[in-house]
Regions:
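Membrane-helix interface "capping/anchor" motifs
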Residues: 77-87, 132-143
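Alpha-helical transmembrane segments and their cytosolic membrane-interface
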Residues: 23-38, 80-118
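N-terminal topogenic module of multi-pass integral membrane proteins
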Residues: 1-72, 206-232
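Structural signature of hydrophobic alpha-helical transmembrane segments
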Residues: 53-68, 110-123, 144-145, 173-176
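C-terminal transmembrane helix-loop-helix hairpin of multi-pass membrane proteins
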Residues: 24-29, 129, 136-232
Length: 232
């Protein structure tokens, strides 16, 4: 509250002083979903046997040269858009594509690795936690992440030698299902961004649904967001 010598007072509530700066960026989620789907298509076809084992190095190159950089771009833009959960998820998958691609490129065709198996178990744990958090606002993402974690666990069991080739082939089936879901998700998110409303259902709820219900509803939580509050 400010006071002048003439005794007049006027209030300057914090919300009236809020300045909104619009960044010239678009959503990185459609790009992330489409590239994720193509990567899963490669992994699924490798596991089922539709891609010959002796072409493993080609698959690794595609994961590193195509999927990884696109996911990286999607991750950066998700952070710029202040979507912490989405950016964290994309970031974890970004480096996983580089890791898996590099492993395939550096290893003899068909070779398994206990180290890769343990990595997949750890990655699956993180993804399951993210899937649980996603149920609060984005159940479609939760289903996608749960399937991805299941695929990792099955592949991990094969890598450490605790399961046979059949389990690895089943993980390939999961990967193909993930590829289809990711393509649907990418199309839905792209249409949503173009129309500024939900066209294909993504079953948003809570704060995720409120993001399309008006500007005031989004400002209600602005003061507590990272980049506005004093500490992360």
């Amino acid at each position: 509250m400010n006071a002048f010598g003439d005794g007049k007072r006027f209030e300057t509530p914090p919300r009236s002083q809020t300045t909104i700066v619009l960044r010239p960026i678009g959503s990185g989620l459609p790009l992330g979903f489409f590239s994720f789907g193509i990567g899963m298509l490669i992994l699924g076809c490798q596991a089922i046997g539709w891609i010959p084992v002796d072409e493993q190095h080609d698959g690794g190159m595609i994961l590193m040269a195509f999927v990884f950089p696109l996911e990286l771009v999607a991750t950066i833009f998700a952070f710029l858009a202040r979507d912490t959960l989405g950016a964290t998820t994309l970031g974890l998958f970004t480096t996983s594509w580089l890791t898996l691609g590099w492993t395939q490129l550096a290893s003899p065709p068909g070779q398994t690795s206990v180290t890769v198996g343990i990595y997949l178990f750890g990655f699956a744990t993180a993804v399951l936690l993210l899937a649980t958090l996603s149920t609060l606002g984005k159940p479609f993402f939760s289903v996608l992440l749960s399937l991805a974690a299941s695929r990792m666990i099955l592949s991990g069991l094969y890598e450490v030698g605790a399961a046979g080739k059949v389990v690895f082939e089943v993980s390939g089936g999961f990967a193909l299902a993930l590829a289809a879901l990711a393509m649907y998700g990418g199309a839905a998110l792209g249409l949503e961004d173009a129309r500024q409303r939900e066209v294909l259902p993504l079953f948003r709820r809570g704060a995720a649904a409120e993001s399309f219900e008006g500007f005031d509803r989004q400002l209600e939580r602005l003061e507590a967001e990272a980049g506005v509050r004093q500490q992360l």
